């Protein structure tokens, strides 16, 4: 599907770990410029930061920014060569938590194939890339799939034009990664797909554990806020009541 509004920012990944850095402030200002408004019709719905942010503290900092601006943030865990290494690194990272803002962050695992190696260029390995951008593209296609439906599974989570993933994950390994809050990229039946709708939130609220539910609630909240702003300061009369009811 066509993306009508997208902003690309070239930032230094290391700078994103500093709350007060110029790059961090630039991203924050861009989000707030369209959310801290009476009219929310042009606000952002997603923030994509490809690759791993480095540690749980930085991930949480950006999750709070996403939460405050009602956007779903998509990012990735570090590239790992095998499942054992990936699981051990996820356990050590301790990314999950019960803070509500973690419900606004989606993290993929298992890098996807960007392109095959070029023998003419003397390359020895295929190029694998973070999956967050591809997943965001799948999620943005709301003409085909409503936001209440997660971009996950064989039918809705297949990534277009992606020809593979680094690790060939077994069912038990997929389940283990889902339990750790990340979204595994799975290559199966000639397709590569996202196989979870989880966020990094693992608290008692089931709604915050699934990004599709968070997206719906954030969207409804912004619609109501925009509507109320449109009718602010109006004297309540039968005519106004009738107009609002018709709207």
Where are each of the predicted segments found?
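Structured, hydrophobic secondary-structure cores that serve as assembly/anchoring elements
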Residues: 1, 39-58, 66-247
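Extended assembly-interface regions of large multimeric machines
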Residues: 1-16
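Generic secondary-structure boundary signal with a strong preference for alpha-helix termini
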Residues: 13-14, 25, 29-30, 149, ...
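A short acidic, often aromatic-flanked loop/helix-cap motif at beta-alpha or helix-coil junctions
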Residues: 13-17, 80-83
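Phosphate/oxyanion-binding active-site loops and adjacent basic polyanion-contact surfaces
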Residues: 16-28, 241, 245
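Structured alpha-helical segments in the cores of large, soluble enzyme domains
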Residues: 23-38, 55
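Aromatic/hydrophobic pocket-lining residues that form π-stacking "cages" and hydrophobic walls in ligand
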Residues: 62
């Amino acid at each position: 599907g066509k993306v009508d509004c997208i902003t690309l920012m070239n930032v230094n990944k290391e700078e994103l770990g500093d709350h007060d850095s110029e790059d961090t402030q630039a991203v924050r200002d861009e989000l707030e410029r369209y959310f801290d408004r009476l009219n929310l019709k042009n606000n952002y719905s997603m923030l994509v930061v490809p690759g791993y942010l480095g540690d749980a503290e930085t991930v949480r900092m950006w999750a709070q920014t996403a939460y405050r601006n009602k956007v779903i943030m998509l990012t990735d865990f570090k590239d790992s060569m095998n499942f054992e290494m990936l699981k051990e690194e996820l356990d050590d990272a301790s990314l999950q938590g019960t803070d509500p803002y973690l419900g606004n962050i989606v993290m993929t695992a298992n890098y996807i194939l960007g392109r095959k190696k070029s023998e003419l260029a003397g390359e020895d390995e295929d190029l694998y890339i973070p999956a967050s951008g591809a997943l965001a593209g799948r999620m943005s296609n709301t003409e085909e799939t409503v936001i209440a439906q997660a971009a996950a599974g064989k039918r809705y989570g297949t990534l277009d034009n992606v020809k593979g993933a680094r690790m060939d994950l077994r069912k038990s390994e997929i389940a283990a990664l889902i339990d750790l809050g990340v979204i595994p990229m799975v290559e199966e039946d000639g397709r590569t797909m996202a196989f979870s709708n989880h966020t990094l939130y693992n608290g008692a609220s089931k709604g915050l554990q699934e990004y599709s539910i968070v997206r719906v609630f954030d969207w409804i909240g912004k619609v109501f806020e925009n509507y109320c702003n449109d009718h602010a300061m109006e004297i309540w009369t039968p005519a106004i009541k009738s107009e609002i009811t018709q709207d």
